[in-house]
Amino acid sequence: MSHLDLTRHRTRSPSPSQIFGSSTTPVATNSTHSEPSASSILRSILGEYADPKRPDVSGADPIRCPVKRVHKTPAVRASSPGRENVPVRTLQSSKDAEGDNFSGDGQLTPCGGPRPLAERLSPKLLAKQTRRKGVGAQKRTKGCDLVDRILTGRSIKASATAASKSSDLPQPQRKGIPTLVKEANPGEADWEDEGLQLEPATKRKYSWTPVKDTNLSIIDLTANSGSSPPSIPGREAQKFTSLVSRYGFAETSPLAMKNEFPEDFPTRKRQLDLLQGTTNSSSSEGSSNKSSGKCPLKVNGTKGRRSRKVTTITSLSTAQYGLKDSPVESFPSVDTTERPSGKRSKSQTKKGGNKKPAGVSDFKVAPTTDALKSLEDQVYLFGTSSQLERVSSDEDKLGVPSAPASSRQSARDRTSVSTLSKYKVSRNLWAAGWRDLDGSVADIEIVDMVNIDTPKSHESSTLTLPSTSTNASNQGFSSQNTINDRSKPSQTTSTTTESTGVESGQLVVPSLCEDLSEKAGYPAVPERETLSSREIASSESAYIETMPSFRGFTTAELAQKVAAFGFKPIKSREKMISLLEKCWQSQHKNSAPTSLPANNANPPDSHASGQKNVVRCDTGGSNASHTTKRASKAPQKKQSTSSTSHSAKAGPKQVDCSQERPNHAYLPHDSTQASSQPVIVIPDSEESGDDFQDTYLGSLNRTSSTNYHPLSANSIPDGSPLFLRTISQASTEEKTSDPSDINQQITRAIKAQPRMTAINGMKRPTWLEKILMYDPIWLEDLTVWLNTEGLDRVGEDREVSRLTVREWCESKGICCTWKKPT
């Protein structure tokens, strides 16, 4: 079976118009320059086997496909600007006879011979064809599509490729079949086989990393051995030591900059450094310069840099830490001062007038130690004006002389610190406030409060009681009502002494007549037993070790003692007292704590006789001088009982007025005054006259660490009946108790106050709620509430003053104020 028969029996394949569709733009057949189409290629291959009576349809069965004639008109180009190169669609005529196909230009189609165009096209059809401007897909007939199209592009069918392969075989040429398609140019037919003949594209670089050297380098690991590997031509073998040597430590950096300047080349910057480097490099030149006697500076032609005068504080402070750069001094020479005599003479004359005297030295910054010493000598004022040292207002009012300047100076000397101590302490808030009166850091020393000297204000505080010889029968005195002093060691007979002196810490209470005691209505003082000398000696030694009563001191004295311990001034009196008590306890913590003798604190004996005695002070008579003796010394011997009773009978005005240590005696104007009235040191102008007098007298009754000073007779006004009255049992217990617990009682009373109900929707907060809400506390209202209701809730019978309440508020950090007078 031939190749033609095989192609006829194949399955019918689509026509070129069906493959490319209407998307392919047809080109006129009579165009001058066009690309070969698929149909022309197929005709060139199957030219000898093509049947003239059958249409040229690629891949179509010629037997089954009916033959129709197609009349083609010349391509009419559209006149519109957008359709210059678009041909008009060809028309098909169904009236044509079978077997006649003509192309548009009159050529013979494969199905028939050439026929004239006028016979096949009527004028009406020709006019209708020219009116059409759009180009669409050709109308399909019932048979095969016989339109010959010239395709654009370079697409090649797979069937054409297979046919081209089969065309290479020798095929017999049939007679009677004319050749319809001319052969194409040989250049146009070979482009498919040869390709586009473009240059190959360069390989794209995805990174700019340098190309690695793929050449192998031979490393000689056996450098010491005699055998060596064969060397590669053009490259020497590298040793392993040379490769590792680059990772070793190099004493001299290879990147060090070398001196590019010659030795004689002068530079403007870093002249001294360059000179020093050049002179050190060549020692031979230095020796030659020394031999010639000229300085290398002069040989090189460079001038030495003059040192600039220091004029700023920064340069002065950093001068001692700077490096001294003086290379000229390393080359001493006699001829170094020789310079050309022209300009040098003028400069020397100018410098001669500006020379300073030899004795005057340049100003230099003092060393650190000298600066610290100078700071020690400066006077600092630390704190506000209220904290500076000044005389208290209490001393001005009461007329108490201030402490001597020597004691203040000694206190300052004790608080002096070392030179560098203030720079060694830790810098915190406590260190900043821990200052003494001089402003330096406080250095606390232990002060001996027992052996302290007696102040001058207390030296002449002995009360002298003169005695006169009068008839004892007129006054009704009896020798049986004599009350012996319990502090007397013994009773001896002495008739030469006519007056009795009262020592510090001793009490002399003579007996008084019964009728006066009955008229006055004062409680009687029962007779007490006489103590032996051994008991009194033990009581004196025990009293020396007891704590002094700081509450009898004035505020100014307390402030001085607090300053003596090295503390800063404290406003609160209670705080100063508690601080002094703690300081005294810390000094005597090694010794066993001892209390006052029992005979000094006990109330009057209940087993005494029911005799009533009234003590009246005598303001007349002669004065006798007596010396004050310290309590540490042995007490003097007193008069015998007979002499004491005789002096008591001598006159009606002879009285020994004294006060017992725990039981303070009051000198009231009014007999109805309460005996348990507390003593307030700071007077208040708003208080009554009786309270102010008690305060004034209580402030004068001060105690020291070793002795007690009773009331002076000069401070008692004349012409007023003053009576001594002993204190009852209740008042004694109240006085002996520590008044510092009154602050605790105030705190308990405020916390114990119950919550109050609201009135008409208005809440009534308690004192504790007001304090917690930082409301201002009226001192008058709080004092009235404490005295009427608050202290009664905690079982406290004492009353507090407004000053006490104010001190309590300040100690707790409570906002308090006085009411404004209306």
UniProtKB/Swiss-Prot annotation:
Domain of life: Eukaryota
One Pfam family per UniProt: Slx4
Role: Regulatory subunit of the SLX1-SLX4 structure-specific endonuclease that resolves DNA secondary structures generated during DNA repair and recombination. Has endonuclease activity towards branched DNA substrates, introducing single-strand cuts in duplex DNA close to junctions with ss-DNA.
Protein's name in the database: Structure-specific endonuclease subunit SLX4
A GO CC term attached to the entry: Slx1-Slx4 complex
GO biological process, one term: DNA repair
Localization in the cell: Nucleus
The keyword Lipid metabolism belongs to this UniProt entry's keyword annotation: no
Biased composition (Polar residues): 13-39, 310-320, 471-484, 589-612
Alphabetic keyword roster: DNA damage, DNA recombination, DNA repair, Nucleus, Phosphoprotein
Family the entry assigns: Belongs to the SLX4 family.
Listed Basic residues bias regions: 342-354, 627-636
Region Disordered, residue ranges: 1-39, 73-117, 277-362, 390-418, 456-507, 589-676
Major place of residence: nucleus
Start-end of Low complexity biased regions: 280-294, 460-470, 490-506, 637-650
Gene from which the chain derives: SLX4
Modifications made to the protein after synthesis: Phosphorylated in response to DNA damage.
Subunit structure as annotated in this protein's UniProt entry: Forms a heterodimer with SLX1.
InterPro entries linked to this entry: Slx4_ascomycetes, Structure-sp_endonuc_su_Slx4
An annotated Gene Ontology molecular function: 5'-flap endonuclease activity
